[in-house]
Regions:
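Helix-adjacent hinge/juxtasegments
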Residues: 84-118
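Transmembrane beta-strands of outer-membrane beta-barrel pores
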Residues: 34-38, 71-75, 121-125, 167-169, ...
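Surface-exposed strand-loop-strand hairpins of Gram-negative outer-membrane beta-barrel proteins
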Residues: 35-54, 184
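Bacterial Sec-dependent N-terminal signal peptides
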Residues: 1-28, 199-206
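Outer-membrane beta-barrel channels and translocator barrels
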Residues: 21-23, 60, 110, 122, ...
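Repeated loop/turn-to-beta-strand initiation elements of outer-membrane beta-barrel proteins
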Residues: 62-65, 113-115, 169-174
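Flexible, solvent-exposed loop segments that connect beta-strands
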Residues: 41-42, 73-97, 125-153, 182-188
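Hydrophobic, lipid-facing positions within transmembrane beta-strands of outer-membrane proteins
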Residues: 28, 47-53, 99-103, 157-161, ...
Length: 206
């Protein structure tokens, strides 16, 4: 039994050493995964691909700053109803394509396990509404329906909070982005709500 505990202790020490970084280390991390998004009045959450790259600088063994670029397809799904209970058509997808610039402070509570929070400016590069084989430009639809009374914001600001775990350079990152910017210029309180889960591999100092 003593040998078993000794072996387990050695394994834990080895894993911790593999995930340890030193002050001054710099890593670059390609990332790919999934985003799960909605907006505050959306009927259903929408699943899409997220991908990008992140740079991380270690100010100390337990503290680092990270910044990067992540491309996400956000938005939501709606059901089409003819009355309260009956669905009469295919679901509608609202696709909001963003280039995001997440900046986070990371605190390693254990070797490889980090809590993170920060700020994320994002820029919408495209938006469309899809139903079946039909695809329409979302900004043109809003302009045709509302005229100049309503404008869609192309800039979005959010607060990312989450955690990550690294093992042998492979990192699993999960975060939730709290939307701060209204999607429209009118009085509606419409905000993005996004979960992002990605896998990455840290290149550089280990």
């Amino acid at each position: 039994m003593k040998k078993l505990f000794l072996l387990m202790a050695m394994m834990v020490t080895t894993i911790a050493a593999q995930a340890q970084h030193d002050e001054g280390d710099i890593t670059i991390q390609p990332r790919v995964g999934l985003s799960y998004s909605n907006i505050t009045d959306g009927d259903k959450w929408k699943l899409n691909i997220a991908y990008g790259v992140e740079f991380e600088y270690y100010l100390a063994e337990q503290f680092s700053l990270a910044g990067g670029v992540l491309f996400t397809n956000q938005g939501c799904k709606y059901d089409v109803y003819s009355d309260i209970n009956k669905v009469t058509g295919e679901g509608i997808k609202l696709n909001l394509y963003y280039g995001t610039l997440p900046i986070t402070a990371n605190y390693y509570i254990l070797p490889g396990l980090a809590l993170k929070a920060g700020i994320q400016p994002a820029f919408r590069v495209k938006a469309n509404v899809v139903q079946g084989s039909e695809k329409l430009d979302f900004d043109k639809m809003v302009a045709a329906f509302y005229g100049n009374d309503v404008k869609m914001n192309k800039f979005d600001l959010s607060i990312p909070v989450g955690l990550s775990y690294e093992f042998k350079g492979v990192t699993l990152d999960a975060r939730y982005n709290i939307g701060l910017t209204k999607l429209t210029s009118d009085g509606d309180n419409l905000y993005n709500k996004v979960f992002v889960v990605t896998l990455g591999y840290k290149l550089g100092s280990h």
